[in-house]
Amino acid sequence: MSGPAMSSTHVVVIPSYDTGPLVYSTVAAARAAWSPVWVVVDGSRDGTAEGLLAMAAGDAGLRVDVLAKNSGKGAAVLHALEAALAQGFTHALTMDADGQHPADRIAALMAESTAHPDAMVLGRPVFDASAPLLRVRGRRVSNAWTNLETLAAGIADSLYGFRVYPIAPLVDILHRQPWMRRFDFDTEAVVRLAWRGVRPINVDAPVRYLRADEGGVSHFRYGRDNALLTWMHLRLLLGFALRLPSLVVRRITGLPPFRSG
């Protein structure tokens, strides 16, 4: 049996916050598919940091960083991206720690990124019967706003966090923004990258919502997180209005992010 694909340019980043035992199987599946894999424990209080550190002690392809306090998904990803950039990595695939994202699709997304290094490779979620209808309908609204804010640049799903980012432009964006540190990270990242001319490539990837009896954990809070998304889209709409003339010129002339191929 062949081992995981190894790369000196592309790294898998898994932020984790109170995910419970599911994080172990998620990390093991990611490691079976890719090397290296970096996990950022974002102030978890569930005791998994110790178990992950033990896994990393016996695995040269696994790195685990433990943050003292919870700062949010975007902050955890930024921590990993800064370290990855310093070590010469150019791209990072982010995936959730709770088993929603398919580790067996890591290689496919990484291959697209290697073939198109100037693009962001976005997972396009394929839902099964486990997907909560309210969540599916809610993301349609957010995706419609994203479509407007990017002048239909081709982002199939702005919320699905299984994706490959070019590291350098995303780190620069995060350093310039006080936001994008929590649930607003995934959507704002792809919108601002598109504004920078980073073209999206969409790749189908199944998503699975685990039940509580399967160990599924959700930190989504309907009121709090929808308020955060509403504020985010207000910011992005203002940014869109300021950038509209240049986006129109890019679309007419076929410049990134609108250029195909």
What are these regions (language model features)?
Residues 17-32:
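Short, well-formed alpha-helical segments that are part of the catalytic scaffolds
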Residues 89-100:
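Short beta-strand-to-loop acidic/aromatic patch adjacent to the donor-nucleotide binding site
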Residues 69-86, 103-183, 210-220, 224-230:
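Acceptor/aglycone-binding surface of glycosyltransferases and processive sugar-polymer synthases
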Residues 2-7, 176-261:
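Hydrophobic helical membrane-anchoring modules
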Residues 38, 50-87:
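Conserved donor nucleotide-binding strand/loop of the catalytic core
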Residues 41-50, 99:
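A conserved acidic beta->alpha catalytic loop
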Residues 21-25, 46-55:
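Acidic helix N-cap motif at the loop->helix transition within catalytic regions
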